[in-house]
Amino acid sequence: MPIATPEVYNEMLDRAKAGKFAYPAINVTSSQTLNAALRGFAEAESDGIVQISTGGAEFLGGQYSKDMVTGAVALAEFAHIIAEKYPVNIALHTDHCPKDKLDGYVRPLLALSKKRVEAGLGPLFQSHMWDGSAEPLADNLAIAQELLETARAAQIILEVEITPTGGEEDGVSHEINDSLYTTVDDAIRTAEALGLGEKGRYLLAASFGNVHGVYKPGNVVLRPELLKELNEGVAARFGKESPFDFVFHGGSGSSEEEIRTALENGVVKMNLDTDTQYAFTRPVAGHMFANYDGVLKVDGEVGNKKAYDPRTWGKLAEASMAARVVEATQHLRSAGNKIK
């Protein structure tokens, strides 16, 4: 199917919220990881979200120029073509963008999509993330207001992170402490600044103990029930039931019960990067170890072209990552829930 239109993306999010499921948002860094994500969604009969971080976009731009906009646009254009071959709806998103990278990433991409919309085309991306979690909340929300207005004009949804997620994601890092929990007051201030849909739709990455990266279960205290408190606190103030569309960041190592509680309390999008990176890399490492005398020219031998052909190990990587995407759709209940 074509990349999701703004109308289809809104329908996807509405269906997820009503059905208490969420879409895996898969970080990609190449055409190969993109194909793996799309394959996983197709095999699971799940619509989904594919996203590009600032680091991913820089990598896609090539190590000569490292231009984030070029990298993101190139993969997005490729995605618009290749997605036609998959029987599911896919939304394109850009992941964490801190203040110092806005002018080199999200703002130019918003301007590009605005021009496309003015020309009668759809936006290149369906949503963008502003990560102001390192900024004071007042400054964070002031920038979010500006970006939300621009995004709305381009028919794009904005994702905002108002309080820190622990660990590190593309250079944005936070300590693991009590600041990792969004308060009802934080949520009310967000609603006051950004509205509850009338100023443009946004996704809220609230913090409930989340940590980016790899950690063992039990090392971090997740409180997904906090999302219910945030929704109820804002609903009591503004009179709108379940006002927020929540995003779950830093979910590696989460238990199925924690994920289930998050879904019951309004999460519609959950980011996956660490787990899919490992799933992609593991079979490649296995292939190299098992075929070291073929992928290397050892003791004067010439190796085995079939062993070191990137397509050989690349197919293994794609299949493994796709399987991890399928698993994610099952945990998040989006499997079998594609828009017919």
Swiss-Prot record:
According to UniProt, the reaction catalysed is: beta-D-fructose 1,6-bisphosphate = D-glyceraldehyde 3-phosphate + dihydroxyacetone phosphate
Q: Which UniProt keywords apply?
A: Glycolysis, Lyase, Metal-binding, Zinc
Give the residue range of the signal peptide: none
pH-dependent activity = Optimum pH is 7.5.
Q: Which cofactor does it need?
A: Zn(2+)
**EC assignment:** 4.1.2.13
The protein's annotated pathway? Carbohydrate degradation; glycolysis; D-glyceraldehyde 3-phosphate and glycerone phosphate from D-glucose: step 4/4
Q: Where does D-glyceraldehyde 3-phosphate bind?
A: 53
Metal-binding in keyword set: yes
Write down the InterPro entries for this protein, in alphabetical order. Aldolase_TIM, FBA_II, Fruct_bisP_bact
Annotated positions binding dihydroxyacetone phosphate:
213, 250-252, 271-274
> What does the record give as the function of this protein?
Catalyzes the aldol condensation of dihydroxyacetone phosphate (DHAP or glycerone-phosphate) with glyceraldehyde 3-phosphate (G3P) to form fructose 1,6-bisphosphate (FBP) in gluconeogenesis and the reverse reaction in glycolysis.
Quote the NCBIfam families the UniProt record gives: cbbA (TIGR00167), FruBisAldo_II_A (TIGR01520), PRK09197.1 (NF006628)
What is the name of the protein in this document? Fructose-bisphosphate aldolase
Q: Which organism is it from?
A: Streptomyces galbus
Q: What is the phylogenetic placement of the source species in the record?
A: Bacteria, Bacillati, Actinomycetota, Actinomycetes, Kitasatosporales
